[in-house]
């Protein structure tokens, strides 16, 4: 049986991402097996309840990387607490660092997702 293709973030910038050979404009949420659009332009737009519901629907996760653009910006403090209640650790960093970290952790077969705002 063939394993589904793992998602690899190949590049980022100019308002989007190249992930496993496909171009994605705007923000995205990436897991090891899929990439989906995320209708968000900045960290300030995150609705904690809606976002936590979206993350919960992704399946089993241990870590969520939040790439906040060109610099590291703090989201609503309730976001980390709500994700922790779901058993998910939130790691906040600039988008470039989040992309690199995602690729390493996916290669290690960790239960991870990345929510990425483009640079």
Predicted regions span which residues?
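N-terminal, charge-rich interaction modules
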Residues: 1-40
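Short glycine-/small-residue-rich flexible loop motifs, especially phosphate/cofactor-binding loops
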Residues: 14, 80, 102
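Compact, glycine-rich, soluble single-domain proteins
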Residues: 31-58
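Short glycine-rich anion-binding loops that position phosphate/pyrophosphate groups of nucleotides
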Residues: 35, 69-71, 118-119
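Mid-chain, well-packed structural core segment of small domains
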Residues: 54-92
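Short acidic loop-to-helix transition motifs that present clustered carboxylates
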Residues: 95-100
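Conserved phosphate-binding catalytic cores of ATP/NTP-utilizing and phosphoryl-transfer enzymes
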Residues: 101-108
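A polyampholytic, Gly/Pro-enriched intrinsically disordered region
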Residues: 108-119
């Amino acid at each position: 049986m063939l394993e589904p293709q793992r998602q690899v973030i190949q590049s980022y910038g100019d308002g989007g991402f190249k992930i496993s050979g496909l171009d994605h404009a705007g923000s995205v949420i990436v897991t090891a097996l899929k990439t989906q659009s995320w209708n968000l332009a900045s960290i300030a737009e995150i609705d904690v309840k809606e976002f936590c519901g979206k993350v919960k629907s992704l399946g089993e996760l241990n870590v969520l990387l939040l790439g906040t653009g060109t610099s590291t910006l703090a989201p609503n403090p309730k976001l980390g607490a709500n994700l922790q209640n779901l058993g998910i650790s939130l790691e906040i960093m600039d988008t470039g660092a989040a992309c690199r970290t995602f690729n390493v952790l996916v290669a290690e077969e960790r239960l991870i997702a990345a929510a990425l705002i483009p640079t």
